[in-house]
UniProtKB/Swiss-Prot annotation:
May play a role in stimulating the translation of viral mRNAs. GO terms for cellular component: host cell cytoplasm. GO terms for biological process: regulation of translation. Keywords: Coiled coil, Host cytoplasm, RNA-binding, Translation regulation. This is Non-structural protein 3. Belongs to the rotavirus NSP3 family. Residues 226-249 are annotated as: Disordered. GO terms for molecular function: RNA binding. Its main location: host cell.
Length: 262
């Protein structure tokens, strides 16, 4: 990959400033600079990590075939253009090698591309063969990927259903909290009304005692004249009765212990 960067810069330099000694010197200085600074090795390491560790995107068989065909056409086109500029097969092959040191002071040839590594293996090992994909492995892997894709779709659907369930439960929780708040408010209001009712009944009993009236509190409240008053002549002995209240209104135990209210 670093060599491709150098080649691209060399091509741009020659096309811009001409194919002369100055352009060649500039390209050599650039290559020496990135080697000395470590940028060359960093680019190679990134390239190796990309091709070894990256996860390929999901593609159909036809898409892979089309991309391979396009890649082959581009490579052939680049080779043809290189041949017209004097960059023959020999030049391309030798450019993929570099001189290095084995650590013992011996000069060795170092391949810089995967293809050059294969060429070097073929040079001294006539029995060298590239490992092939085991029979049926590709089909098996494709089936496993399809199965995993189905499982993934099922899990996505279940996750979506769980999210909807959680959302509904959150809504139920909010409604329950609101209902609980309303219930507490109603309890407080009911207790306040009960206290006011009891106080009103107490006051009524006190007033009845003060004015000599009888007050009967059961399911309703009845106020009548006292039996101690004398009968009026010429009239029937009738007791004026005033009833009010609603069923269920019972006076508390405090009323039974009341004395006359002054």
């Amino acid at each position: 990959m670093a060599e491709l960067v150098c080649d691209a810069l060399a091509t741009l330099t020659r096309n811009t400033y001409g194919n002369n000694d100055e352009s060649a010197k500039f390209c050599r200085m650039f290559r020496a600079m990135i080697r000395d600074s470590g940028l060359y090795s960093n680019i190679e390491n990134w390239r190796a990590a990309f091709y070894r560790d990256r996860l390929p995107k999901r593609m159909s068989h036809s898409t892979v075939s089309i991309q391979l065909d396009n890649l082959e056409r581009e490579v052939l086109k680049i080779r043809a253009e290189g041949f017209c500029q004097g960059y023959t097969r020999k030049e391309r092959t030798l450019n993929a090698f570099d001189l290095g040191d084995d650590g013992k002071g011996n000069t060795i040839i170092k391949p810089t591309t995967h293809l050059s590594s294969i060429i070097l293996q073929n040079s001294y090992n006539s029995a060298f063969k590239l490992p092939k994909i085991p029979d049926g492995l590709l089909e098996k892997t494709r089936c496993e990927l399809e199965e995993e894709k189905k499982n993934n779709d099922v899990l996505k659907q279940k996750i979506k259903e769980l999210e909807n369930t959680i959302s509904q439960l959150e809504n139920f929780e909010n409604e329950a909290k609101a209902s609980e708040f309303v219930l507490e408010h109603l309890k407080f209001t009911n207790e306040s009304l009960r206290i006011q009712r009891d106080e009103a009944q107490i006051c009524l009993v006190g007033l009845c005692n003060k004015f000599g009236l009888q007050c009967e509190i059961d399911n309703s409240i009845r106020v009548t004249e006292s039996d101690k008053k004398g009968k009026r002549k010429g009239r029937k002995n009738r007791r004026t009765e005033v009833s009010f209240g609603a069923p269920g209104h019972n006076l508390t135990d405090q009323i039974n212990a009341l004395s006359d209210v002054e």
